[in-house]
């Protein structure tokens, strides 16, 4: 039984407004092969960066509430700790203001992210001065802050120096849409990922069984292209991704990889095998599937997947279509 998935192009991919002004799912089949149509990508990759500059160091003015709470820094009482962390809330985004902490001339704080978008203090409308608040920085070093993913179930309390690193890999952080491309901005808990795919990405075909054939059509399309298919077996769902991109100037390559709709710990229970077979030739790749928490971008960047160029693809292709045998096994 064969299902087809046709090519399509991938479309390219505010702090408080008042403050700124003052500054899978498709058909489920029981067949053994599915056809994935291409999604062409017109967007490039981008990176963002930021910088912060430390201004004048002074014994900064602090509000009376800050002063009255300083003696409690480092205390063990949970309620008092919560009171202290509330002093660090940014009045614009309600995230925490962490060192280096800058204040306005009246002692009001705002986080670095929002500060870059403002022309005046969101609290008093006074000028934003580059004044370091050393007293609040000292308090911050003795306070434990909740993980920003606490709403998703994380119970960690962290000193500010460990907060960013923890949050980047927190197991409770929301899952992003696993589909290639930057057009879908959905994020949410793991148990809603499949529901999202079924509702918002209905063109993706799902095949049942641990052995299937992933048939990518029109592999000779120019530009950046991707093919996606779902595979369901062992009570889990796997997403098969084939991307064609120009990783080096003038040299297009194919990257094939499998990711589990699940956590990294769950992914450790499986191994996947990709095989190109035909014309008395065979090309194989075997590895642990990626968790969708990790995504596939870093694996593709590091070539930690099945990689082959367009000339190799032509050795296995039939009239512009490429079949990849996919096998999922329990470890």
Swiss-Prot record:
Cellular component GO terms held in the UniProt record: cytosol; nucleus; ubiquitin ligase complex
Top-level taxon of the source organism: Eukaryota
Residues binding Zn(2+) 2: 177, 184, 196, 201
Residues covered by region (SBD): 139-331
Zinc fingers classed as RING-type: ranges: 90-125
Pfam families assigned: Sina_RING (PF21362), Sina_TRAF (PF03145), Sina_ZnF (PF21361)
Broad enzyme group: transferase
CDD domains: Sina (cd03829)
Catalytic function, reaction form: S-ubiquitinyl-[E2 ubiquitin-conjugating enzyme]-L-cysteine + [acceptor protein]-L-lysine = [E2 ubiquitin-conjugating enzyme]-L-cysteine + N(6)-ubiquitinyl-[acceptor protein]-L-lysine
Principal location class: cytoplasm
Record localization: Cytoplasm; Nucleus
GO molecular-function terms, A-Z: identical protein binding; ubiquitin conjugating enzyme binding; ubiquitin protein ligase activity; zinc ion binding
Claim: Disulfide bond is one of the keywords in the record: no
Pathway assigned to this chain's UniProt record: Protein modification; protein ubiquitination
Zinc finger SIAH-type: from-to: 142-202
PROSITE patterns: ZF_RING_2 (PS50089), ZF_SIAH (PS51081)
Quaternary structure annotation from Swiss-Prot or TrEMBL: Component of some E3 complex at least composed of sina, ebi and phyl. Interacts with eff.
Domains: entry comment: The RING-type zinc finger domain is essential for ubiquitin ligase activity.
Protein name per its UniProtKB record: E3 ubiquitin-protein ligase sina
């Amino acid at each position: 039984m064969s299902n087809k998935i046709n090519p399509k192009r991938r479309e390219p991919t505010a702090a408080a407004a008042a403050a700124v002004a003052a500054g899978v799912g498709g058909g489920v089949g029981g067949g053994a092969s599915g056809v994935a149509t291409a999604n062409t990508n017109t967007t490039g990759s981008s990176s963002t960066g930021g910088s912060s500059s430390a201004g004048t160091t002074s014994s900064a003015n602090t509000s009376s509430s800050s002063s009255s709470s300083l003696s409690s820094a480092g205390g063990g009482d949970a309620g008092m700790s919560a009171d202290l962390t509330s002093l660090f809330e940014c009045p614009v985004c309600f995230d925490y203001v962490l060192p280096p902490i800058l204040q306005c001339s009246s002692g009001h704080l705002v986080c670095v992210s929002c500060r870059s978008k403002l022309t005046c203090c969101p609290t008093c409308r006074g000028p934003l001065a580059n004044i370091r608040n050393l007293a609040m920085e000292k308090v911050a070093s003795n306070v434990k802050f909740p993980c920003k993913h606490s709403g998703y179930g994380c119970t960690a309390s962290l000193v500010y120096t460990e907060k960013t690193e923890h949050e980047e890999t927190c197991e409770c952080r929301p899952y992003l849409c696993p589909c290639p491309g930057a057009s879908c901005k959905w994020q949410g808990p793991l148990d809603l990922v499949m529901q999202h795919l079924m509702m918002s990405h209905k063109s993706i075909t799902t095949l049942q069984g641990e052995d299937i054939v992933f048939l990518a059509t029109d592999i000779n399309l120019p530009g950046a292209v991707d093919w996606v298919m779902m595979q369901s077996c062992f009570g889990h769902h796997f997403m098969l991704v084939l991307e064609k991109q120009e990783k080096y100037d003038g040299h297009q390559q194919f990257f094939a990889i499998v990711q589990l709709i699940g956590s990294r710990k769950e992914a450790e229970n499986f191994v996947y095998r990709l095989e190109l077979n035909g014309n008395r030739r065979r090309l194989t790749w075997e590895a642990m599937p990626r968790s969708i928490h990790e995504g596939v971008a870093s694996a593709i960047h590091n070539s930690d997947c099945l990689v082959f160029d367009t000339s190799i693809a032509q050795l296995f292709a039939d009239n512009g279509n490429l079949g990849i045998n996919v096998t999922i096994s329990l470890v």
